[in-house]
Structure formats: C-alpha cells, structure tokens
C-alpha cells in the first residue's frame, strides 16, 4: 500500500503523526528502507463517518529483520498517545521512564509518534543485546565491538529464538561500516533514484550457532554506492574465517571497501589525465569525448588516404583495467549495415604509464595496426 493511499484512510486528526512516519521516517542503520504501515483498521463504530482508521501495523527495518508492531490510537480522543503491541516480541517490555516523548506526548508536534518509535527501537536494541548473555561467545563478539566507537555506535543486533531441542540460538550483527564515500565522483552517483537516501555500506554477519561454527557475512550497499562501484557483482567480501572474530573481520571488510572506493576515485582522475593527453597529441583529430566521466573518446584519423575512427572505452577501474580500442572504417559496411570495425585489447599497455606515455604508445600502435585493419576492411567489408 502506497503512503498516499494509507494516509487517505487515516482519521484526519491522526494523519499528521502517521504522515511524518511514512514520509520521513527512517529509523536505525538501514537508511534505504522507510517505515511503512499496513493492516489499517478502525476502533470507531460503524456509524462514524470516514476516514476513521486509527490503528495499524508499523513495519520497522532492524538488523536485517522487519519488526511488526501494532500501534493503536483512539480517533475519538486524538490528543492521547497510542498503545503499542510488540507482536512476536512478547518478552520485550520497554521501560516507560525512558520513553520521554511518550511521557510528555505533544499532539501539536507531528513528529511525536516518530520520536516515540525511535526511543522504542533504542530500547529494543538493548533488549536484543541482553539476550546475547546466554552465549559467552556471542557476548564476547558484542563487547569487543562495543569497545570500538566506530563500530559500537553503529550496530544493530538481533538474537533469534532459542531452540528448545538443542539449546542453541542464532544471532545477527548489522554494522554500518565507517567508509568515506564523499570523494566518489558525482557523475557516478546520479540517475540511480529520485530519493536514494544516505550513502551507506552495511555488513550483516549471521551466527547460526553460539560457537560460531556457521557464520555467514553479507555486504549491503545503498543503491548509489553499488552503482558507483560497478554493480552488485563487483565486490566480493572474504568468507568469515574459522575461529575468527568480528573485531578482526570487520576491519578487513572496511579495508577492502575503502580500497575499492580509492580505485574508483583514482580511475576518474587517471581517465581525465588520459583524455587530456590524447587531446594534446591528436588535436583536431578528436571527434568527441566524455567530458563528465571521461569514459569515452573518439578519434578521426587518416593513414595514406584511408580514413578511420578509433573509439576508446576507458573502464571504471582504469588504469588497472586496460582500455578497449575499436577501429572503425568510414567506408566499409558489414552485411548487417554497420560500419566495419575491430576491437583490440592486445596492444602495448602498462597501468604504470602516465597519460602522456599512453598517448604516445597508442599513436605508435595505430601506425603499426592500421595497415592490417585496412586490409581486413577491404577483404571483409562492403563499400
């Protein structure tokens, strides 16, 4: 159900509270997922004119789970705070003295419900952390992370229910990784989503037993960061080592991700240097180039009255990855009506060369390759 449809069914006096939750409500580490509501119902009599829904189920992303709490207002007394039912978490009994926004409920503040939900989630986090005491190993993992502010202050924990047969229970740690994305070129962060939310990397580590014999890590990137780093398949994190600890493993993943970000930033500056060198060496032979991301360059060149195009595609992780050179005849066509072309990646190249050296080497390679390309164009293409 879309937020707008849900809000149209809410009692008008309660609508500001719910609007703040579903439109602006981001609670916890997963900034890519908003709060949402379902199961709208009314406690009013059937004679009460609508819209009159005053109770609903609130879905809250937390540590890779979705908490489903029932929130119950009274449309007849909209100035009163709501009641809460915590679904399957019957053992969760929040401390009323710590719910300051509930104790001093201010119906004139549209965000008062959202503020109470945030306080409840904080208490729920403490409740889950307390459940780890049943396992000395999992408690050790938690306490060692807690000693490092960069991890301890950005962590959510969900401890699964205890297995009555084995006495075991699972636990999941969700951590917001302290990786700086601010220097990623802005062109890579565009056109992903109208409201992409915060740029964030979350590491989920699931312990399927209390002795950490089955541990499953997974990395989640916000949409813009995933796009900027080359897609979901571009980054593979290492398996959790047998006998390893989170306090050793998490910095490894941070280091891997930081290096990936640096590769992207370095690639952008190196591509710009590369294209600047080609502009200098080839001058009026440059037909067009990508002046934003510096990922493409097209040259129009001539060799013994034979005109041809060279399309240069620079990869995201340039200079580590070699550019592709595509030679294209301006005279010859394939059977499908396309200009005859050949792509080349087997040419002299070193990622250690600067842009000027790459341009000089490319010019030398063009002179050696063009004769055989011209011959192939005449042999395989049609005028």
Swiss-Prot record:
Residue numbers spanned by region UEV-like 2: 275-364
Alphabetized Pfam families for the sequence: BRE
GO molecular function, one term: polyubiquitin modification-dependent protein binding
Positions bearing N-acetylmethionine: 1
Subcellular location: Cytoplasm; Nucleus
Transmembrane segments: none
Disulfide bonds: none
An example Gene Ontology biological process: negative regulation of apoptotic process
Entries under InterPro entries matching the protein: BRE (IPR010358)
Modified residues (Phosphoserine): 2
Record bears the keyword Methyltransferase: no
Main location per the UniProt record: cytoplasm
Tissue: Expressed in brain, heart, kidney, liver, lung, testis, germinal center B-cells and various mouse cell lines.
Annotated region described as UEV-like 1, given as residue ranges: 30-147
Superkingdom, taxonomy of origin: Eukaryota
Keywords: Acetylation, Apoptosis, Cell cycle, Cell division, Chromatin regulator, Cytoplasm, DNA damage, DNA repair, Mitosis, Nucleus, Phosphoprotein, Repeat, Ubl conjugation pathway
GO cellular component: BRCA1-A complex; BRISC complex; cytoplasm; cytosol; nuclear ubiquitin ligase complex; nucleus
Function noted in UniProt: Component of the BRCA1-A complex, a complex that specifically recognizes 'Lys-63'-linked ubiquitinated histones H2A and H2AX at DNA lesions sites, leading to target the BRCA1-BARD1 heterodimer to sites of DNA damage at double-strand breaks (DSBs). The BRCA1-A complex also possesses deubiquitinase activity that specifically removes 'Lys-63'-linked ubiquitin on histones H2A and H2AX.
Subunit composition and interactions: Component of the ARISC complex, at least composed of UIMC1/RAP80, ABRAXAS1, BRCC3/BRCC36, BABAM2 and BABAM1/NBA1. Component of the BRCA1-A complex, at least composed of BRCA1, BARD1, UIMC1/RAP80, ABRAXAS1, BRCC3/BRCC36, BABAM2 and BABAM1/NBA1. In the BRCA1-A complex, interacts directly with ABRAXAS1, BRCC3/BRCC36 and BABAM1/NBA1. Binds polyubiquitin. Component of the BRISC complex, at least composed of ABRAXAS2, BRCC3/BRCC36, BABAM2 and BABAM1/NBA1. Identified in a complex with SHMT2 and the other subunits of the BRISC complex.
Similarity comment: family membership: Belongs to the BABAM2 family.
Domain-level remarks: Contains 2 ubiquitin-conjugating enzyme family-like (UEV-like) regions. These regions lack the critical Cys residues required for ubiquitination but retain the ability to bind ubiquitin.
UniProt protein name: BRISC and BRCA1-A complex member 2
Organism of derivation: Mus musculus
Name of encoding gene: Babam2
């Amino acid at each position: 159900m879309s937020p707008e449809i849900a809000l149209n069914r809410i009692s008008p006096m309660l609508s500001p509270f719910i609007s703040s939750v579903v439109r602006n409500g981001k609670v916890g580490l997963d900034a890519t997922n908003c709060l949402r509501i379902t199961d709208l119902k009314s406690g009013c009599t059937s004679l009460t004119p609508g819209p009159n829904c005053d109770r609903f189920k609130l879905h809250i992303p937390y540590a890779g789970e979705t908490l489903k709490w029932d929130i119950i207002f009274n449309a007849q007394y909209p100035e009163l705070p709501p009641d809460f039912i915590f679904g399957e978490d019957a053992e969760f009994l929040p401390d009323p003295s710590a719910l300051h926004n509930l104790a001093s409920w201010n119906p004139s503040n549209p965000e008062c419900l959202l503020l109470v939900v945030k306080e409840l989630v904080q208490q729920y986090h403490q409740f889950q952390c307390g459940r780890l005491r049943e396992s000395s190993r999992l408690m050790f993992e938690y306490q060692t992370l807690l000693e490092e502010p960069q991890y301890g202050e950005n962590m959510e924990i969900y401890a699964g229910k205890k297995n009555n047969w084995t006495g075991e229970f699972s636990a999941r740690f969700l951590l917001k990784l302290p990786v700086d994305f601010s220097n990623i070129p802005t062109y890579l962060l565009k056109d992903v989503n109208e409201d992409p939310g915060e740029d964030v990397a979350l590491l989920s580590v699931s312990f399927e037993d209390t002795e950490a014999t089955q541990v499953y890590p997974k990395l989640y990137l916000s949409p813009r960061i995933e796009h900027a780093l080359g897609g979901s398949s571009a980054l593979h994190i290492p398996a959790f080592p047998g006998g390893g600890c989170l306090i050793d493993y998490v910095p490894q993943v941070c280091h891997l991700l930081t290096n990936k970000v640096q590769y992207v930033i370095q690639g952008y500056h190196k591509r710009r240097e590369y294209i600047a060198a080609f502009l200098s060496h080839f001058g009026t032979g440059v037909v067009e180039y990508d002046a934003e991301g510096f990922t493409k360059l097209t040259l129009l060149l001539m060799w013994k009255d034979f005109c041809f195009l060279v399309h240069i595609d620079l990869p995201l992780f340039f200079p580590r990855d070699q550019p592709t050179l595509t030679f294209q005849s301006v005279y010859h066509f394939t059977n499908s009506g396309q200009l005859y072309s050949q792509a080349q990646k087997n040419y002299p190249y070193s990622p250690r060369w600067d842009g000027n050296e790459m341009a000089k080497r490319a010019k030398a390679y063009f002179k050696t390759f063009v004769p055989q390309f011209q011959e192939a164009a005449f042999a395989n293409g049609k005028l």
